[in-house]
Swiss-Prot record:
Binds 2 potassium ions per subunit. This is Betaine aldehyde dehydrogenase. It catalyses: betaine aldehyde + NAD(+) + H2O = glycine betaine + NADH + 2 H(+). The gene is betB. It comes from Serratia proteamaculans (strain 568). Keywords: Metal-binding, NAD, NADP, Oxidation, Oxidoreductase, Potassium. K(+) 2 binds at L246, K457, G460. CDD domains: ALDH_F9_TMBADH (cd07090).
Amino acid sequence: MSRFGLQKLYINGAYVDSTDGKTFNAVNPANGEVLAEIQSASAEDVNRAVASAASGQKVWAAMTAMARSRILRRAVDILRERNDELAALETLDTGKAMSETTAVDIVTGADVLEYYAGLIPSIEGQQIPLRDTSFVYTRREPLGVVAGIGAWNYPIQIALWKSAPALAAGNAMIFKPSEVTSLTALKLAEIYTEAGLPDGVFNVVTGSGAEVGQYLTDHPGIAKVSFTGGVKTGKKVMANASGSTLKEVTMELGGKSPLIIFDDADLDRAADIAMMANFYSSGQVCTNGTRVFVPAALQAQFEAKILERVKRIRLGDPTDPQTNFGPLVSFAHMESVLRFIESGKNSGARLLCGGERVTEGEFAKGAYVAPTVFTDCRDEMEIVREEIFGPVMSILSYQSEEEVVRRANDTTFGLAAGVVTNDLTRAHRVIHQLEAGICWINTWGESAAEMPVGGYKQSGVGRENGLMTLEHYTQIKSVQVELGEYASVF
């Protein structure tokens, strides 16, 4: 029997069996251990979840703002109390190092929930005077039942990023985690119930995106879909959502983000930033700065600093607190990353380090890929143009500011970008020209609860986090009041 046994669906405040009996396995990518057998939701199960959510949403929306706020803040407290327990489960399910999951995944997810819990009482409309005898007032009302579809790289954080603004605005959410990493979303559902969330307001349906995800995007009882994942899948989700019942959508999709290092930059700081922008979470971060642009005159120096830092990476068992680089999320994803690495080798890029699966000793049981750095890369190479979502850095040289801005923008993606320079005038000038939704100056990767995040171009639609996201989980009702006489033309 697997370590965590059979995992059921979470509907109407309790675990329930799927109606069709289909299951899939949760696998620890560090060693291939089957962690759990997880039930897959059927169309009938999704119908149950939607009916439950519709009923629960009416109860939730009727509660006072302060009452809703207190319940979500109670959930924040429980998340923080159980941080280490949840982090340990996230590490087993994703392969991410415990040093990361204990410090980031649950912590930042709880921060977002706390942020939106505090904003609930501030959701208000406007009063617009028309004349002495008439005025208009507006109400921000919830959409109703919304769906969240998560990615596998930050399972519980994404579940919180999606559910926090949705619930804060008075909606109910049906959440489908990635079938690769489903375990912590189910724990989050338990926590919401324990905190006092009415039954049905947060349901979890597990299963594949192709089946369960499509049930959600097609369902007429769902008003909005928020999706995190790849561009190809995102386009299908958006088409299904709009083609079925004209649902609203939020899409947080892929990226191939440029990190531009200028000639006046502190090269040590630049190298530190490049390392974090490529190898944190074993390179499985959508905002990673995988196209590293370096002045041609500084390329050799920069490469030496990167190699020096790669040697300091502590690849190992992700449950070891000393490890800071674990396996990839699955064996299938490892094969995808290795195919990109072979493409890099065959395209003429110069391999500085890595470029292979790690198979020494116990590592042979896991989905480990060595931190990989290519240099002398060209813009047309596949490793430079396509999102790899793994520990693969591409170094490109350039001659002028104008050139590097043009090349940085020469992509269908537009999720993130960054510059490293001591010249703040140049920093702002360049950032204002970069076609990306999230930009960093002399840093990389932080996405605070208050900061709207999302992409330009094919990297997404809409934003997550920040004030504006809360607005997109509501709809405006305008009401005109006439206090004076009414004159008919008939």
